[in-house]
Amino acid sequence: MKTKARTLLGAATVALLTASTAMARPDQERVRWESFVGNIRTGAAGAVGSGTGAVNAAGAPWVATRGDARVNLASGNLRFRIKGLVLADTIFVGTPGNNPEVVGTLVCDTDGSAGGGNSVLVSTPPVPLSAQGDADFNGNLGSLPAACVNEPDIAFLVRSVTGVYFAAAIVREP
């Protein structure tokens, strides 16, 4: 009887160890960025990502005064806050221009190495962008694609609803 119990315990231990190594470690499940920087290089010259998943920078430079973003890769929970996201040039300088909404976008596998040369994009629903350039999202994106969970190169952008990005999150941890 003791031999059977030990065998079952040993099998259960091996199964648990195998399952735990296949799952993301808790310190790798959560990614955060502590700041945002507005796009400096405009158009394709400032693109983030690869192939069909590349996101071009907006046609004019933008600035952001502060913000942060956090994502739990295992659950799909994401939160971002950005303040002072405004144009740094054009006749609309100091305002968000004609952009009443923005989306937050994860750019997964930025070098395209896992996706045949293409990055994978996952975006939030549109959220309001105030006249002062403030936007906030807190929600769940659902199950994230493998490129987001398994690849270490992930970027976070705040974009227009038409696709170009205004700001990139910087200082990624971990």
Regions found by a protein language model. Name each.
Residues 25-68, 72, 173-174:
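N-terminal segment immediately downstream of the Sec signal-peptide cleavage site
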Residues 1-9:
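Bacterial N-terminal signal peptides that target proteins for export
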Residues 56-96:
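Short, surface-exposed binding/anchoring microloops in extracellular/periplasmic proteins
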Residues 67, 80, 102-104, 137-139:
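Hydrophobic residues positioned within well-ordered beta-strands of beta-sheet architectures
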Residues 93-113:
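Extended low-complexity, serine/threonine- and proline-enriched intrinsically disordered segments
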Residues 10-18:
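Bacterial N-terminal signal peptides
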Residues 114-174:
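Helix-rich interaction surfaces within compact, conserved domain-sized segments
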Residues 20-24:
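Sec/Tat signal peptide C-region and signal peptidase I cleavage site
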